[in-house]
């Protein structure tokens, strides 16, 4: 259900390349730079989910060194009114040239098979088509998906009895074919929602899908969940307990929406939590201010949260923002950021002082809390929501997956004291499970954070 970014190429009138495997991802990136230089244009290389998450052996080829060129000033590239009109002419001329190129380039290729059925496709859908049909259909593969060829499509259509477009999401190729007078089948057969697979395509066309090959080992499912010992867990438990409206942001903490926490109410894009909360509270007034918060990670805050809290402070919005400082950019693979004190190479670098920054933009109420201390977290949240001014709570504890973080020994369960009440299960830790009427701790996952111990009223969980 990813966005169909092909629309951007059409709206901006810039070429788009769509690789269908790992090798093409490499080759098309090279071609993108070549086309950019030749046609003086940005080029989009569209990577869909399956291409990005797949891997295969690639042939690298010989590295080409590009000589540096002197920078030359060109005031016509500044889009003032007088220049924008000239630029529009250049864009239209470039589009005509790129369309002519699309007719002859090897990026768009025809693979003739049985002529009873012709299929036009692109991206990962091409791989599914080849797996389902093999030589039982002729295929026009569009590696350059915008601008699309006109004559090439018409010529291909003339060589087959029936023409079908197989593409994920929107009917963009299908609509193009109809606009140039080529009759095709498309979304009346192929789903518009969710990603395609070999099975989806086969069943959509009334064919029998190949059976899945089952793994010999029965691997248990792994639903999206915050890691055992994640410092965000105590924050979201506290927010859920206090029935807060939580405006989320982009990061591991987006998983706060998952059960049993069910703590997140809104999530749009990086930085939207702070400015969104500000607008929400301005619109809702005092009724909303006392139970609404924004949550944003330290790296997302450095990326685009600072302007949002500046707006809150400047307008004296009675809003509470929680900055979840786990000392790293967690979700995308532990990259450094301006709050960690190291650059992307791991070298010492300047470090943003979050408390000082928040005070500098106008917050008088700034406090730091350890999120694994549930009582302290609850106290801080209640006090800041009750305050009649903007406030910041910095939830500070390193990501448990950092190599520098020492894990405590796993906890144990006193089975004589445990009555299976399930209170500890409310934090949603993957190291905890109910086996029969008793709680069980997975010692391979437990990092001894002791958050669950604070939930147990019978002292049944022990370090």
Language-model features: locations:
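Conserved thiamine diphosphate
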Residues: 1-42, 48, 82, 290, ...
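Short glycine-enriched loops at secondary-structure junctions
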Residues: 1-3, 122-125, 249-252, 325-328
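Short, glycine/polar-rich helix-capping loops at beta-to-alpha or helix-loop-helix junctions
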Residues: 1-5, 127-129, 148-152, 173, ...
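Short secondary-structure boundary/capping segments
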Residues: 3-7, 59-64, 135-136, 179-181, ...
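Acidic-glycine-rich active-site phosphate/pyrophosphate-binding loop
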Residues: 5, 243-258
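Glycine/charged-rich beta-loop-alpha catalytic/anionic-binding loops adjacent to active sites
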Residues: 10-18, 219-221, 254-267, 286-292, ...
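Flexible, low-complexity linker and terminal segments
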Residues: 19-226, 231-235, 240-244, 248, ...
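Thiamine diphosphate
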Residues: 257-394, 405
């Amino acid at each position: 259900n990813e966005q169909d970014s092909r629309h951007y190429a059409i709206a901006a009138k810039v070429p788009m390349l769509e690789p269908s495997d790992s090798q093409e991802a490499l080759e098309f990136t090279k071609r993108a730079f070549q086309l950019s230089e030749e046609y003086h244009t940005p080029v989009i290389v569209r990577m869909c989910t399956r291409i990005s998450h797949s891997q295969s052996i690639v042939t690298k080829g010989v590295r080409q060194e590009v000589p540096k060129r002197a920078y030359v000033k060109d005031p016509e590239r500044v889009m003032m009114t007088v220049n924008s009109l000239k630029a529009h002419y250049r864009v239209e001329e470039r589009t005509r040239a790129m369309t002519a190129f699309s007719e002859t380039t090897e990026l768009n290729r025809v693979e003739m098979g049985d002529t009873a059925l012709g299929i036009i496709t692109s991206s990962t859908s091409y791989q599914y088509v080849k797996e389902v049909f093999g030589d039982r259909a002729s295929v026009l593969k569009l590696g350059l998906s915008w601008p699309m060829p006109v004559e090439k499509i018409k010529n291909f259509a003339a060589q087959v009895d029936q023409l079908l477009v197989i593409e994920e999401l929107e009917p963009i190729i299908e609509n193009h074919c109809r606009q140039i007078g080529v009759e095709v089948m498309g979304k009346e057969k192929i789903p518009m929602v969710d990603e395609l697979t070999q099975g989806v395509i086969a069943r959509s066309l009334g064919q029998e899908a190949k059976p899945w090959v089952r793994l010999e080992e029965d691997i248990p499912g792994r639903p999206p969940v915050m890691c055992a010992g994640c410092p965000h867990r105590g924050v979201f438990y506290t927010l859920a307990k206090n029935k807060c409206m939580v405006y989320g942001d982009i990061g591991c903490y987006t998983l706060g929406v998952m059960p049993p926490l069910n703590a997140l109410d809104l999530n749009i894009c990086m930085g939207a939590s702070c400015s969104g909360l500000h607008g929400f509270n301005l619109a809702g007034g005092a009724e909303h201010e006392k139970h609404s918060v924004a949550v944003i990670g330290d790296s997302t805050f450095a990326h685009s949260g600072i302007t949002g809290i500046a707006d809150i402070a400047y307008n004296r919005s009675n809003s509470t923002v929680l900055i979840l400082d786990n000392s790293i950019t967690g979700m995308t693979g532990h990259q450094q950021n301006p709050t960690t004190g190291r650059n992307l190479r791991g070298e010492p670098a300047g470090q943003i002082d979050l408390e000082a920054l928040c005070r500098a933009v106008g917050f008088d109420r700034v406090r730091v809390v350890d999120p694994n201390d549930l009582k302290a977290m609850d106290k801080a949240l209640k006090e800041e929501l009750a305050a009649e001014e903007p406030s910041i709570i910095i939830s500070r504890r390193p990501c448990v997956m950092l190599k520098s973080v020492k894990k405590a020994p796993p906890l144990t369960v006193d089975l004589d004291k445990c009555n299976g009440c399930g209170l500890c299960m409310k934090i949603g830790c993957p190291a905890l499970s109910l086996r029969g009427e008793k709680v069980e701790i997975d010692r391979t996952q437990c990092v001894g954070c002791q958050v669950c111990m604070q939930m147990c009223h019978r002292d049944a969980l022990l370090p």
